[in-house]
């Protein structure tokens, strides 16, 4: 509710604030009415949910945020992202803070992890930045003999890379 109230500052006081808040992602549904109404009122905020996905599986089913991606995908007025790497997060946050200020912009929902991942060392080209914001990019472009493409998002990146290596060796 506080994010929604601060996110309405432009329509109430003529000055836009850029509030950023955190939430325990598995329990985002507990504040879903406030999130929905905030988006319907064109409130602008960035909400960060951690930990995303099933990274807390040992703690039981209530601690797995399996359905929360659907909230970000289906709620009008909010853009949802689940980056795997910090360079992606940097690109998304920079874009998101700009998007929140645009007349036709909206809010941002980031689903992040607390699980450590090895970070890539790569050149962030303009094309890569655009692809990150648009939701997908090739980690490795498929060659002419490609038989399988594995798509992923978020914290499972290292597991996907391991699976791809295993499949390549098994072939």
Language model: regions and residue ranges:
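Conserved thiamine diphosphate
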Residues: 2-149
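Redox- and metal-dependent alpha/beta enzyme cores, enriched for Fe-S-associated oxidoreductases
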Residues: 152-171
